[in-house]
Structures are given as C-alpha cells and as structure tokens.
Amino acid sequence: MIEKSVAFVEGVSKELYLKTGVRFVIDMTDFEKNPIALALKKERQNYQEGFLKQLKPPFVVFFFYHDAQKIELVANPKDLLDTDKIFFEKIAPLLPTNAKEYTSQRISAMLINGYSVAVDALAEKYHVNIVQNFNAPKGVTFVKVVIYILLLTLLGAFLGLYFFKKS
C-alpha cells in the first residue's frame, strides 16, 4: 500500500477502536521480505488461523495475498459485519483483471474502498461517527444536493429572464 493509505488506515483504525472497541487490521503479506508459501488455500487458512489467534474479539481483518492474488475479509464474531456483501459489492469490482494492473496504487484504492465501506458499516452498527473516514455515501449526497441547487438556480434565472423580457 502507498504511504498515504497506510496513514489513513492507521488513523481510522485507532479512532474506530477508541469509539467501538473493534479492532480493524489489514494484513498484507510481503513476499519479497517474507517469502512464505501461501499459494495454496490450505496454506493461507493456516496462516490466517495463526494470525487470528493473536487478536481478541471483536475484530475485523482484511487479508491481502499479493502473489496469490487473493483477498479475505474476516470478522469475529461473524455477525459483526456482512463481509460477503462488502466484498462482492465494493471490493470485487475493483479487482485487477491481469497482472499488469496489480500496481500499488490500484491495490491501495481497492483496499481503501473496501476498508472505508466496512468502517462505515461498523460505525453505523455502533451508532458512532468516524470523523477520519471518507464517508462516501454522505459525500455523494452532498454533491447531488449542490448540483440540484445549481440547476434550479440556472433554471430560475433562465425563466426569470424569459418572462421579464416579454413584459
């Protein structure tokens, strides 16, 4: 992940933990620095089990295996988060389709998008506001309102000029 993304995740994770008690971790295996064999599903499951034993519930872990090109989103307890919905609706559409697209920027965008949506879902469940998160749906609503106001203003100006010129 790129540096800005790491700083964003650390800040949001800290705020999420302080407000909800839920830990949210992104685990990215770095095969250049730590060459462990995780190409097979069984190897990844064993790695995940070992990693998850270190954490105390409630938690969410986002596993990203670069070389295997696999992603796992794990929540404990399982009803903490709808991991399948987040994966298939928010992460899967951004998955690279070939090896050339596996750039650090693309990976960061994909992980941050899924992470941000998951944090929003947790914040909503715990009735808290995570200030440092993107809050994408709220931003989209704000932009739509501004566009509608501008359109109505232009329409009003046009109609006003049209009717006042006639009289």
Question: What annotation goes with each model-predicted range?
Answer:
Residues 1-141:
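Folded, non-transmembrane soluble domains that reside on the lumenal/extracytoplasmic side of membranes
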